[in-house]
Amino acid sequence: MSLQSIKYKRGSLEILDQLLLPVVSKYLPVRGVEDGWKVINKMQVRGAPAIAIVGCLSLAVEIYPEEFETKKSLRQEIEGKLNYLVSARPTAVNMKISADELITLANELSKNDDVTVANMKQRFLDATEAMLEKDIADNRAIGSNGAKAILERVAEATGSPGSASPVRVLTHCNTGSLATAGYGTALGVVRHLSELGKLEHVYCTETRPYNQGARLTAYELVHEKLPATLVLDSMVAALFRVKNVAAVVVGADRVAANGDTANKIGTYQIAVVAKHHGVPFYVAAPLTSIDLQIPSGEHIIIEVRPDREMTHVGEHRIAAPGINCWNPAFDVTPASLITGIITEHGVFKPSTLKDEIAKLIEL
């Protein structure tokens, strides 16, 4: 059974504090937008899909007990608070896209004379809550599409179409139930391979400096009893040389229109090594992680985190006092290194991504 990182019922929101994992499992109440901003910014909740869901639901929790005299005041509250939430972690595009959708909805409802203030509030709450269920459904579709793509590629490479043997895969950072509403994106692909009986082994990187792989992905894999091994970030090249890894599958915080992908720091170097060893490299991401307004990775804003995340583990200093640090939270993997981008609507080559997504948006 997958872990539950988000607990929600109308008027109440709790998140599993991921800074305490894997030692302590503790849920934190999120009573409104200020709490939502803080848990996102402090990375007590993380993963682009989860950030968007928690951010939007924190506003739903805040608005639920409030009374608004006019639709205009409700619209202004929604717009102002959502724009504030976007600032908590700007690299992850999902929060911005979700905020824009909800702001558009609020504007449309406020202009509709047939909609009362109470109706407008109700429909806003319904829309935010629908995001939770949609994310889980999208993740399951991503898992199915990704597993199929990997198995088909392996079968083709081994000359045995339709009958691929169980595979070994590598994943980076955390993209499972803890990073989404449930099931996961890249880890959802791993889960689906397991459900098909086609997962021989999954390797997860520690993912320094925040150790999301060691603390969170390993926690999920052990919880679900999947065959898994933790490796250091610096071991990936050696792993590819000796362990016959069939594919790499990672998540994404933002995918540009040309397929360039911003993801957790360390993703780029894994893609370079995968290319050298001929290992297919897949990005698993919902459409909400794809930003067609960004032409390439050069235009993606990369969040830089505090030095302390590198110099300390918990309260213990591990680096020499006085040393300078450079701590970007993400890097950008060029589209040329990406085999395919796995979405809930299929697997697309980076070169055709923009046109394929544009077609889907038109439907």
Swiss-Prot record:
EC number: 5.3.1.23
GO BP annotations, alphabetical order: L-methionine salvage from methylthioadenosine
Major localization class: cytoplasm
GO CC terms of this entry: cytoplasm; nucleus
Disulfide bonds: none
Cell location: Cytoplasm; Nucleus
One MF annotation (Gene Ontology) recorded for this entry: S-methyl-5-thioribose-1-phosphate isomerase activity
Catalyzed reactions per annotation: 5-(methylsulfanyl)-alpha-D-ribose 1-phosphate = 5-(methylsulfanyl)-D-ribulose 1-phosphate
Gene3D superfamilies: translation initiation factor eif-2b, domain 1 (1.20.120.420), Translation initiation factor eif-2b, domain 2 (3.40.50.10470)
Active site: 253
UniProt keyword annotations, A-Z: Amino-acid biosynthesis, Cytoplasm, Isomerase, Methionine biosynthesis, Nucleus
Keyword hit for Heme: no
Pathway: Amino-acid biosynthesis; L-methionine biosynthesis via salvage pathway; L-methionine from S-methyl-5-thio-alpha-D-ribose 1-phosphate: step 1/6
Family to which this protein belongs: Belongs to the eIF-2B alpha/beta/delta subunits family. MtnA subfamily.
Role: Catalyzes the interconversion of methylthioribose-1-phosphate (MTR-1-P) into methylthioribulose-1-phosphate (MTRu-1-P).
Protein name in UniProt: Methylthioribose-1-phosphate isomerase
Native species: Drosophila grimshawi
